[in-house]
């Protein structure tokens, strides 16, 4: 599980599982993605901690078109996609979802505020979370007290940030007090 999560964490905004080239050609792949924020002008202005832009586009129309293009170059119509929330920011952008390949499941995020029937036009399932292969998929990272039975939480919401641990005892050994919690992996 840990080795898979490390490989996955190095991916771009999604990752697919594949066993062989034959399976990739003949069997559906599984993709995870999150925080597409279709239609969101503000996300084009978000900055990383180092001051660089989180997304390279200047406006949401340009961003949406390029993301749809990249999605459909990667995801085939029969592939399964778990979208871990914050799919669109406004109703106008909902229609963008009809252009996306894949059998899609939405794990609802804090910006997914529209009625269920508005999302069901584009997603086969709507969920609060999903358990898969001993991992829990969610939008917001789950509380660490609930993580024990899963081991790993694949989530969205944090964009370029990571879940950190604080340990006051580490400073007595000259180590940083905060460090990355490797049980969490942000898409």
Give the positions of each predicted feature.
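Aromatic (phenylalanine/tyrosine) cluster motif
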Residues: 12-17, 22
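Catalytic phosphate/metal-binding cores of nucleic-acid and nucleotide-processing enzymes, i.e., regions
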Residues: 22-187
């Amino acid at each position: 599980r840990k080795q898979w999560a490390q490989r996955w964490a190095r991916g771009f905004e999604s990752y697919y599982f594949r066993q062989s080239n034959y399976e990739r050609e003949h069997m559906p792949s599984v993709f995870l993605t999150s925080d597409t924020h279709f239609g969101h002008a503000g996300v084009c202005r978000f900055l990383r901690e180092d001051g660089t832009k989180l997304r390279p586009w200047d406006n949401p129309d340009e961003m949406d078109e390029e993301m749809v293009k990249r999605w459909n170059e990667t995801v085939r119509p029969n592939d399964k996609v778990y979208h871990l929330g914050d799919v669109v920011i406004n109703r106008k952008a909902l229609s963008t979802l009809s252009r996306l390949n894949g059998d899609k499941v939405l794990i609802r995020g804090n910006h997914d505020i529209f009625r269920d029937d508005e999302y069901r036009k584009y997603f086969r399932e709507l969920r609060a979370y999903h358990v898969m292969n001993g991992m829990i998929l969610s939008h917001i990272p789950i509380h660490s007290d609930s993580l024990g039975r899963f081991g790993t939480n694949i989530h969205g919401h944090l964009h370029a940030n990571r879940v950190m641990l604080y340990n006051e005892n580490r400073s007595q050994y000259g180590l940083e007090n905060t460090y990355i919690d490797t049980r969490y992996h942000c898409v």
